[in-house]
């Protein structure tokens, strides 16, 4: 997992082979997301606000 600069998210991991993303929140919980396209992961990692991108694009989607 790669540490990120965010007030809510601590780290993000992504496996392009399985399209599985893991997001670890600063509160301690880690969530898995399945079927995440590579461009969504790249968008998250390059977003000006990782938390806002997560809320807009990932949250409540890509459930495993």
Roles of regions detected by a PLM:
Residues 1-64:
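Acidic/histidine-enriched, beta-strand-rich ligand/metal-binding domains
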């Amino acid at each position: 997992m790669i540490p990120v600069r965010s007030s809510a998210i601590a780290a993000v991991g992504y496996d392009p082979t399985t399209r599985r993303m893991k997001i670890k929140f600063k509160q301690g919980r880690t969530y898995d997301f399945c079927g995440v396209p590579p461009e969504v992961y790249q968008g998250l990692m390059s977003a000006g606000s990782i938390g806002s991108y997560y809320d807009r694009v990932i949250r409540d989607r890509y459930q495993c």
